Amino acid sequence: MNIGHARRKITPQGDIYLIGYRNLPNRLEPATGVHDDVFANAILFQQGEREVFLFNADVLEFEESMAEEVKTMLAERYGIDRDCVLLSATHDHTSIVAYHRSWWTGKFDENYYRWFLDTICQCFEVCRANAQPAICRLGKQAVYYT
């Protein structure tokens, strides 16, 4: 088995609108600054010809349409099985909205969206390039405390 990983900063440049917490009036305005950057992390497991790609980002969620676009793009470009691409979000209510087409606050940014898709592909490429032999083990143990 080989495993590769990648990490990318995904904080947008310029005006950054935040997602989540609908009842805050300032959600309709851009953020006043960046307290902490947001990141994406990826890991690729390879066993023979089989690959499983996990991509996680510090965002609220992935819309189904975006997830479908990502899976199609990775399958067409790199030959990975669509069912072996998993996207997850940290569900961060203070993250960016630029990638989200249908959120009610903030502003969707087509350029950022395309850049984000590109970043996912770059993470896949980096994972493949730095994949190294690894051993995966699974254990289970009941722990009791008083």
What are these regions (language model features)?
Residues 1-88, 95-146:
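Conserved beta-alpha junction segments in alpha/beta enzyme cores
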